[in-house]
A protein has these predicted regions:
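…; additionally, a secondary subgroup of soluble metalloenzymes is captured
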Residues: 1-411, 418-572, 576-662
Length: 662
């Protein structure tokens, strides 16, 4: 139709079209499209920054952008400025959202595959123009970053910066590595296509890479660190990896030095060797990956605690009074026993594993000296039969501990059968997280621990504890004697005698306490409630080398009891009838009797045994042979044992715990 108009587009000039073609065009001439005029119109601008027209490469991508985008933000005041144009270009071409990207922004962007693909697809003139803009805004390391990007190393920008940290920062204080640094820097410069990478540029790159690394989730950060290790190797700079506070290999190198230091100390427990251990530990803890494996980290810390302990307590006490030995165990040696258990699991680093093995053997040797001293003093205590004011026997615990507290507050008296002091130390931390804080009724006279009966077996020691007298017995006897205890009855209300619950009274896997137990704890007139929990002792009797329960959740139904006691505003007294030792390659000494760690007083007494006799020895004729060493057992292998005279078995914790708001 005559009203229709046809628009033809061409990239040819008028002189190339010929007069016959021009004759057919409107006004007989070629109408030139002015790109910047189109761009201005789309931004509703009347003027523009003159600097923009000096970048001819911009026209094509900007025309495409304004043609494809349905709406554009109008230029403020009708003036199209450089920032607006760069924001559109970088966002649409590279997925870079900032018009003036910093070095950190560029490194963050380089972690996106989409952005790097977009860069690779740009025409060369656009790469040069954008590259110049990036150099202008990315600081001292800008030229090197753009050079690496142009050389196709964009996905490695963060990892290269980690390498720069070693080349330009960490190695600066190690002149012996100067030759390695010089050659490796040359290889890096060639790889990223730059003539010279100066110290200032390298350090700036390193700083921003570390900042970006700190923002990444652990898995992505590890990828960058692994890649940095590969680059170090390709630049023949492996010798520098040990200087890094970030590379996985450098942590292993530091841990290897820690393992070597532990090994030296295990062979010769000297203060100088301990200093080396602590220095190696400090170096390891300074590494950014130190906390990435909490379980391993805790085992390494335990190894260093053991190292400190064996140096400080290598020799037994000069004055071997039982009261002092009991307190020394509860305050010091029990921490050593707790820490050395963590060494059994070892470590995947063979040098660390060897150091732990040697340290564990040394700890056992040191502990044996203390155990022999303790057992000798315990032997004298049992023989005398007299109660000592500064030594609390389990048979006196109700009278000297529970009754005084119950006179002032309703009490839940918990007996965790078989709980050693080291296990209690772990449990106490869990209790504190739940708001149960250890207190002392009287800081001067409150006992840190009590001494079990001999043999340190449930039938003797628990019955004596819950009866308030030296005797053997089962649950029925304990229940009756507990209710009849004169000291407890004196602080109880009429018609509400002390009440004791055993395993049969407690829930198994069911939810909630049995009604009788719950009602007793909730009853404000029931002054004393006792509960025996067998979870720990039950684990000891198993043949599998399973972990001893040491948390509230693992010791069922402790959590339910604590929650009920908290609601009833009861004070908590926590103790045990005896402790235990773990199965750690004990020597089996054949015996016709069933007990694991005691035998009748017949036959010769071995150097690692003691003949104990006296009123606190609850066996025929009040005589028995027990080992003072933790290396001997008389029965089949189990998870743990008790019955002997080591402090691990004979010293039990005594703790008064109050709610944090009390």
């Amino acid at each position: 139709a005559e009203t229709e108009k046809l628009v033809l587009l061409t990239n040819q000039k008028e002189q190339e079209l010929g007069s016959d073609v021009l004759y057919r065009l409107a006004l007989s001439r070629l109408h030139e499209v002015r790109p910047w005029q189109v761009i201005l119109e789309r931004f509703q601008a009347r003027r523009w920054d003159s600097r923009l027209t000096k970048e001819p490469w911009m026209e094509a991508p900007l025309l495409r952008i304004v043609a494809e985008k349905q709406s554009l933000t109008p230029a403020p005041g009708g003036f199209l400025d450089e920032e607006t144009i760069w924001r559109e270009l970088l966002t649409e071409l590279l997925r870079l959202s900032e018009p003036r990207p910093s070095a950190k922004t560029l490194l963050r962007w380089s972690l996106s595959r989409e952005g790097l693909v977009a860069w690779a697809q740009l025409p060369n003139d656009a790469k040069m123009g954008i590259g110049a803009h990036l150099v202008e805004h990315t600081g001292p390391c800008g030229p090197a970053l753009v050079s690496a990007l142009s050389a196709g190393r964009g996905e490695d920008l963060v990892s290269i910066g980690l390498v720069c940290d070693l080349l330009f920062s960490q190695a600066a204080t190690h002149p012996e590595l100067s030759s390695v640094v010089l050659k490796s820097t040359g290889r890096l410069e060639s790889w990223i296509g730059i003539g010279t990478l100066g110290t200032e540029e390298g350090r700036a790159w390193a700083t921003v890479s570390q900042e970006v690394l700190g923002e990444l989730p652990p898995d992505r950060a590890t990828q960058q660190l692994r890649r940095a290790e590969q680059l170090l190797s390709s630049f023949h700079a492996d010798a520098l990896s040990s200087l890094s506070d970030a590379l996985p290999s450098s942590l292993e190198q530091r841990l290897t030095r820690l393992g070597e230091a532990l090994g030296h100390l295990a062979r010769a427990p000297k203060r100088t060797h301990l200093d080396a251990v602590l220095a190696a530990l400090a170096s390891s803890r300074a590494h950014r990956l130190w906390n990435h494996e909490p379980g391993r980290c805790e085992r390494l810390l335990s190894a260093c605690r053991v190292a400190q302990a064996v140096v400080s307590v290598e020799s037994p006490l000069e004055t071997p009074r039982l009261a002092e030995l009991v307190n020394h165990y509860a305050d010091t040696l029990a921490w050593l026993d707790r820490a050395r258990e963590d060494l059994v699991e070892g470590d995947r680093n063979p040098v660390v594993a060897a150091g732990m093995t040697g340290l564990y053997s040394l700890a056992v040797t040191v502990r044996e000296r203390h155990s022999q001293q303790f057992a000798t003093a315990l032997c004298d205590f049992c023989a005398s039969g007299h109660e000592q004011e500064d030594v609390l026997g389990v048979e006196s615990l109700l009278q000297r501990v529970v009754a005084p507290v119950a006179a002032r507050s309703p009490v839940l008296f918990l007996v965790l059968d078989g709980m050693s002091v080291p296990v209690f130390l772990s449990l106490r931390e869990d209790l504190a997280r739940l708001g149960w804080i250890e207190a002392m009724a009287n800081p001067v006279t409150w006992p840190r621990a009590a001494v079990a009966m001999i043999p340190t077996e449930t039938e003797a020691s628990r019955a004596s504890l819950l009866s308030g007298r030296r005797m053997r017995g089962q649950a029925g006897t304990e229940k009756n004697r507990f209710a009849e205890h004169s000291g407890l009855r004196q602080v109880s209300q009429s018609g509400k005698p002390p009440i004791l619950f055993h395993k049969a009274d407690l829930p198994g896997e069911s939810v909630g306490l049995h009604d009788e137990v719950r009602r007793a704890i909730e009853d404000p007139e029931q002054q004393v409630v006792g509960v025996v929990i067998n979870a720990i002792d039950d684990h000891l009797s198993k043949g599998d080398q399973i972990a001893i329960p040491q948390t509230v959740d693992a010791i069922r139904p402790l959590g339910l009891l604590l929650a009920t006691a908290r609601a009833a505003h009861r004070a908590l007294i926590l103790t045990s009838d005896h402790g235990h030792i773990r199965e750690r390659g004990l020597t089996l000494r054949r015996s016709q009797e069933r007990p694991s760690r005691s035998r009748t007083a017949t036959g010769p007494v071995s150097p690692d045994e003691l003949l104990m006799e006296g009123p606190r020895v609850l066996s025929p004729q009040h005589k028995i042979i027990v080992p003072w060493s933790e290396r001997v057992r008389y029965a089949s292998e189990k998870c743990g044992y008790h019955g002997g005279a080591t402090p691990q078995e004979a010293v039990v914790p005594v703790a008064l715990l109050l709610q944090s708001e009390q």
